[in-house]
Amino acid sequence: DFNVPQNKETGEITSDKRIVAALPTIKYLLENGAAVIACSHLGKPKGEWKEKLTLAPVAKRLSELLGMEVIFAKDIIGEDAKAKAAALKPGQIMLLENLRFDIREEKNGDDFAKALSEMADLYVSDAFGTVHRAHASTAGVAKYLPAYAGLLVEKELSVMGKALDNPARPFVAVLG
């Protein structure tokens, strides 16, 4: 989940906490020979391309954190993304442009989900904050590819499970 807070004037990332949280899964995949295609939404562009909501600054920050190039696709399922995905080698990572620049993402458009899935061999869900959403990049893609939980999702589920299975008393749960 790279939906990170940004400075409204400059577009500069003001907290990279969510990017850092994704690093264990990304590093695990890269170190084990995967070619990684990362994707995320940023903000609510409602299907329109908006420069302030591009994921280019996220690709730059992710590159700094990983200490390696993060290839950035200037589209989502267009020619740039497809060509870069096809050329991706094991141990390389690419980030697609903001998924919500395409209106079909939030509508769980089957054709959009299918096009996303055609660039990959499997799907790793590592955005705990979005797993409940029936969007093309989550529920839709999982219809076409073998799907797995990433390390962050696994960690969140483990923490929740422990809290619910054997909570310290007194115990109050507020879920939203």
Which residues does each predicted region cover?
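Active-site loop-to-helix "anion-binding N-cap" substructures in soluble metabolic enzymes
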Residues: 1-176
